Amino acid sequence: MSDPQTSMAATAAVSPSDYLQPAASTTQDSQPSPLALLAATCSKIGPPAVEAAVTPPAPPQPTPRKLVPIKPAPLPLSPGKNSFGILSSKGNILQIQGSQLSASYPGGQLVFAIQNPTMINKGTRSNANIQYQAVPQIQASNSQTIQVQPNLTNQIQIIPGTNQAIITPSPSSHKPVPIKPAPIQKSSTTTTPVQSGANVVKLTGGGGNVTLTLPVNNLVNASDTGAPTQLLTESPPTPLSKTNKKARKKSLPASQPPVAVAEQVETVLIETTADNIIQAGNNLLIVQSPGGGQPAVVQQVQVVPPKAEQQQVVQIPQQALRVVQAASATLPTVPQKPSQNFQIQAAEPTPTQVYIRTPSGEVQTVLVQDSPPATAAATSNTTCSSPASRAPHLSGTSKKHSAAILRKERPLPKIAPAGSIISLNAAQLAAAAQAMQTININGVQVQGVPVTITNTGGQQQLTVQNVSGNNLTISGLSPTQIQLQMEQALAGETQPGEKRRRMACTCPNCKDGEKRSGEQGKKKHVCHIPDCGKTFRKTSLLRAHVRLHTGERPFVCNWFFCGKRFTRSDELQRHARTHTGDKRFECAQCQKRFMRSDHLTKHYKTHLVTKNL
C-alpha cells in the first residue's frame, strides 16, 4: 500500500554477474544509484602500462553492458483523493477507489484479509536474517488494553493511523476460556430434635466457629410445655461490628403474642464441636473437650437481663439445660483463666491430734479438725488440683481452745527434715494450738503431721517425728534420741536471773560439767547413742560422728548436675577436687601429684620398696 506521492523501491535482477540498479516508481525518470556509477567507473579504468608488459596476457573479460533502469508503468490516478495503488511482485497494479473506503470503512481504515500468509516467506532469498515482530493490542469494551503476543507464522497485523489494533488470529490459537465466578456459599439449616427425657442440645455442625441461636422460651423441658422441635441455624462467623453488637439481642416480629420470655433471644458463640453445657442459675458453663490430649476449657456465659426501662423480663428455669455428654469419660485438668469460676467442695474432715506440754508438766491434747468452706457460694479461681483454703475447728481439754475456732490459720515456719530443731516464740506456740499445721518440705505439702512441742525456760522447740504422708518419708530422730532431748530440755530449766552457759557438746561427759584435770590427754567426749560408746577429743568430731547415726548430710556439692551430700565438710572439700582437678600433694622424689594425701602416702611406699631392693 502506497500513496502517489510516496516512492517505492523495486529491484531488478538481470544476471548473477551483473549489477543491480534500482528504479523509481514515480512518473519522472530517476538517476542511477551511486553504487552503479562506481561500478561502471571502475570497469572502464584499465591496468597500468608498466604492469601490462610484465604480466602475462589477461584472459578475455566479458564486455560490460550498461543497465537500463526498469521503470514500472505509471499509476493512473483517479479523481478521488483517497485512491490507493499497490504494485505486486509480478508487476500488476491493484487500484482501490476512495469511494470504497468511505462506504465500507467510515474512518478511512483499510483492512486486508490475506488468505495464505505463508506466501510471504516464499521469496528468492529464504536465508535472509530479517525478522519482524509485532505485538498487537486488543481494545476491550471497558477501556482496558490487553497485550497479546501473536504467532508470526499464522497471523498478520495491520495497524492504521488511528492506533487501533485489528488482528486476524488463526482458529487454532487464542481460544477464549470462560471464567466462572466462585459459587456463593449458602447457609445450611440443620434440624435437631430436643430429647424429651434429658434436655440435651447437640451441635451437628462441623469444625470451626458455629453460631447457635436459641430463644429462651424453647429451653424449657419439652415434656412439660410441649415445645416444638428446636431449629438450629448454622452460619459462618463474621467479624463483630457496631451493627453486629447491637444485633446480639433482638426481638421477634410483632405479629406474635407479646410474651416477655419469648422476646429475648441470646446468641452463644461456641468454638469447638464437643460441647458440654451446664446450667447454674443465670450462668451457662460450657465445657469444651476437644480431645487429642488437649486440656478441656470451661467458658462461662452469663445471661444478662435487659434494663428496667425496657420492661422486659428474662427468666431461665433451673431445669433448662443439663449436662451434655462429653466426648470422653474423663476430662483433663481445666487450665486457669481469669474469667473462669467454679466451685470446689472440701472432703470430709480428718481430725489430727496434737500434744502440748506446758511448763508445769501437764500434757494437753488438742484435736485439729478441718471444716468445709464458710459459704457455699464462694468460688475459687484456681485449678482443680490445688487444695482449697479451709477454716480449722479445734476441740481441746481447756476452755481457752474453744475461742480459736473463728481465728485464721497461721502456718508455722518451714521445718527442715532429719530432726532439725526450730525455735518458736510464744505467739507461734499459741498459733500452733489454734490452727491445723501445713508443713512444706521441698515443695511438698504434708497436712496433719503429728508433732511434739516441748517447753523450756522461755524457749519453745519443735521436733519432727518419723511420719509418712503423700509418699514422702521424713527421716527424724529415733525415739531414744527424742526422749533424751526432752530430758535435756527439762533439766536445762534455770531460774529467771541465772546466766546460762553455752554448751558446745551435749554428751553425758560434758553435760555434768565435771572437769577432769588429771585426764587431759584422754578422750572425754563419748557418743551417747546406745551400743556405740565411741569417744572423741573434739566436739566437732563428736558431732560429725552423730550425723552418721542420724543419717544427716548437711554438706551438699554445688557443682553442676552433681548434688552429692556429705556428713563432714572435709569430705565435701575432698570431693570438690574431683571436679576442679586440683592435685595439691606432690611426691618429693618423682614430682608426681595426687588429690588425696593417703594416695601420696601409698605412692611413697613404692619408692621405699624400690630403694630396699
Curated annotation (Swiss-Prot):
Its main location: nucleus. One of its GO terms (biological process) is immune response. InterPro entries: Znf_C2H2_sf, Znf_C2H2_type. GO terms for cellular component: chromatin; nucleoplasm. Residues 1-32, 225-258, 372-404 are annotated as: Disordered. Residues 23-32, 225-235 have a biased composition (Polar residues). It is found in: Nucleus. Residues 372-389 have a biased composition (Low complexity). The keyword Metal-binding applies. The modification Phosphoserine is found at S78. The 9aaTAD motif is a transactivation domain present in a large number of yeast and animal transcription factors. In SP2, the motif is inactive. Binds to GC box promoters elements and selectively activates mRNA synthesis from genes that contain functional recognition sites. Belongs to the Sp1 C2H2-type zinc-finger protein family. This is Transcription factor Sp2. It comes from Homo sapiens.
